[in-house]
């Protein structure tokens, strides 16, 4: 099968949708090598992000010819990709980041699949500009309704796509995200290298994600101040936004600024080692499409404390713990419990590793392939 992808995130985004997109291609190239995979991106972006993908003979990257560079990314993606896809005799096109090229809506004999990651802009409009909410609703909704099949990364998002966009239930399938297998194989020297290079504290709890209001890092800072264990620090790894100033101000006011470590633009090389050195992983986000950092932590053998109210229970499973995202006392109590109760800690680690076996690359490649094959049956 010839399968094409919108690769803008693969070539340009180091985290989030970029990680998801690269994971999908890594899983498919390893477990479905008989297919041909064509990546269409408006720019070469950051080659270090996808260099290993291009080592597979089944993968080809296509970017605009210099003569077409003036079109800009959006125009090229919406009007040139459909023509290129048909010329390449592509069987199926998968939009990995919430949308399909406009011209593909009317394309003949090309199956279409789109992944919708979340509808947070509808559920939590206060975190988005009005113009962004309008654009997202139009693009995501049009793509979901036009695609032959919609993939969601959680059951919660599946229900949202069905209820909000009116897509038929049989056209929406949940295929969970996964993470690199290197998080399950962290070596002691990786932990040491990360600790030395980044000057990490000896003992810490960990948060990974953008430092933005929706991720709710303030709750972790407030819990840090209430812990029985005053030797434990908080390490937060992620992109900074203006919200970071609120976090710093709160930490200063609570007297825990010296125990807060904000790491920005950390290389992917060090991330497994950072996980490996943590005693507990905290993720009090108010809303997520899924929660990949939770999967990474469980793979690394780190007890996870998430938050109620979205789909984090799907990512963390039944033996992870969950706090009310507005209750710092509750989060502090759960952290203390994980640190003190050795039996609980061992149970969370062992059961967590068993739970994340459902998010392996092999299983996800299988589930995606089943969707692709189902779509292509309608074109026979």
Task: Please tell me what each predicted stretch does.
Residues 1-380:
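Carbohydrate transferase catalytic cores enriched for Leloir-type hexosyltransferases
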